[in-house]
Amino acid sequence: MEIIFYHPTFNAAWWVNALEKALPHARVREWKVGDNNPADYALVWQPPVEMLAGRRLKAVFALGAGVDAILSKLNAHPEMLDASIPLFRLEDTGMGLQMQEYAVSQVLHWFRRFDDYQALKNQALWKPLPEYTREEFSVGIMGAGVLGAKVAESLQAWGFPLRCWSRSRKSWPGVESYVGREELRAFLNQTRVLINLLPNTAQTVGIINSELLDQLPDGAYVLNLARGVHVQEADLLAALDSGKLKGAMLDVFSQEPLPQESPLWRHPRVAMTPHIAAVTRPAEAIDYISRTITQLEKGEPVTGQVDRARGY
């Protein structure tokens, strides 16, 4: 079994060594320009077109949970990968726990009004504030995939009312499920904290705009953990300035790194992190990839395959 690996920043030697330990019968090599030798599987992130074009691969693994970048390249270069070759994304591989940590910590930060207390500290004001109740602090999750399910599971322990919005109906215990555009308004109307975990598709680009934000309760919060292109940044800032939104926490942006001239840097009710909410953890990724390749070789059912038409 031949496996090729390409990632512009990862330590290729470590990955090659770890994969060969996990798959003793495999020969793994870092792909370099000019390497046209046969391969059965490819592990990639932002691969050059020539790496995959013309290869008779059994499968390709994208080294991340999001596949919008590679799908965009495939759409621009259909010759890059035959439509019959399955494409897999990393399923969880430690990202679920990271998303749980991030989402729970931020929801609790807002629920306990730590942002308000920080603002009072900056004014040297000692002023206890009225508490929020859990009943009025409903959390709505847009996107009900693997990571959305993990976030909902972690928030349940804290007793917040939970709801999710997705393409298909979910039957998660303790979570109200809303489906499609026809149920979006009902989902938003009672959502105090909106958590975005949607995939990046043509249908979801720009979805968090003034029309959507206007349907949230006054004083709502937005937590974006998915993709920057989901948010119309000017609309978000307008909602913050008007008081419609009380705060926003952003991990992703339409342009990364975020330009220094962006007003998001200076807005007092915007907090941000540099796209670190959930990063690929190599050991967990190796475990998932080696397990999935073994299942594929045995003809067993697998999970994590990308539906190219849907975009996730």
Curated annotation (Swiss-Prot):
It comes from the Bacteria. CDD domains: GDH_like_2. Keywords: Cytoplasm, NAD, NADP, Oxidoreductase. The active site is at R227, H275. Pfam families: 2-Hacid_dh_C (PF02826). It catalyses: glycolate + NADP(+) = glyoxylate + NADPH + H(+); (R)-glycerate + NAD(+) = 3-hydroxypyruvate + NADH + H(+); (R)-glycerate + NADP(+) = 3-hydroxypyruvate + NADPH + H(+). Its main location: cytoplasm. It is found in: Cytoplasm. Its EC number is 1.1.1.79, 1.1.1.81. SUPFAM superfamilies: NAD(P)-binding Rossmann-fold domains. One of its GO terms (cellular component) is cytoplasm. HAMAP family: 2_Hacid_dh_C_GhrA. This is Glyoxylate/hydroxypyruvate reductase A. It comes from Salmonella heidelberg (strain SL476).
